[in-house]
Structures are given as structure tokens and as C-alpha cells.
Regions:
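N-terminal leader/linker segments that precede catalytic domains of diphosphate-processing enzymes
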Residues: 1-79, 84-128
Length: 128
């Protein structure tokens, strides 16, 4: 019995993703060629994003959001749904699903987490 397109995509993605959230390595190992003008002034803030593969009649699409131009941080940016981890979040996956619900109304129970990407420090600090 051949795999359906949905199952085939899910299997391919889950084979290439991490099975659990990674333990963050030292900063210099994450982005070895990145040399900021100054080192981080504050400890990084744990956050999570959801890279949602959405099934539509015309095929699968990736979900992006456009952040409001009125926001203090990351205003006007196109981004994956996501944000800071809250103390009540049971995991980074729970945080990403909660943020997707808050930002675009995605019901967490409708999602299936296929895996995790490696931790990445952006080093972004916006000043206005």
C-alpha cells in the first residue's frame, strides 16, 4: 500500500528533525562565524517558534505571520509564530503551540509536532 502524500511528508520531516529539544551548546558553537560588535549584554531569553506545515486544497504551505508595525520588538517583521517561554509552558513545543494559538488562532490539538530544530541564538537586540 503506497504512503499518502501527507504521511510521506510527515515521515520524511520526522526523520530529519531532532526527536527532543536540544541542550543549548556554548554560544560560540552555535554561530561560529558570527562576530557581533559587542558580546551579549544580557543572558539570552528562551523562546520557541512553530514552523507549521499547513495542508490546503492546493498543497502544503508554510505558515508565516506579519508582526504589527506597532509592536515594540520585531515590529513589521515576517516571522514564524512564536515567542518567549512562559513559566506555565510544559515544553518548548507547548510554548510554540501556545504562541501560534495566540497569534493566529491555531488550535494546539490540531497540530502534531514532528520534531525539533537545533537551538539558534539570533543576537537581536533592537533599539529605537
Amino acid at each position: 500500500m503506497p504512503l499518502s502524500l501527507d504521511l510521506s511528508i510527515g515521515l520524511t520531516l520526522s526523520e530529519r528533525l531532532l526527536t527532543q529539544p536540544p541542550v543549548p551548546p556554548a554560544r560560540h558553537l552555535l554561530v561560529p562565524d558570527w562576530a557581533p560588535e559587542r558580546p551579549f549584554e544580557r543572558p539570552p531569553v528562551p523562546a520557541a517558534v512553530l514552523i507549521a506545515l499547513v495542508r490546503r486544497p492546493e498543497g502544503h504551505t508554510i505558515l508565516y505571520t506579519e508582526r504589527s508595525p506597532d509592536l515594540r520588538a520585531h515590529s513589521g517583521q515576517v516571522a514564524f509564530p512564536g515567542g518567549k517561554l512562559d513559566p506555565a509552558d510544559a515544553s518548548v513545543a507547548a510554548a510554540a503551540l501556545r504562541e501560534a494559538n495566540e497569534e493566529v488562532g491555531m488550535v494546539p490539538g490540531d497540530a502534531r509536532v514532528l520534531g525539533y530544530m537545533p537551538t539558534y541564538y539570533t543576537g537581536i537586540r533592537l533599539t529605537c
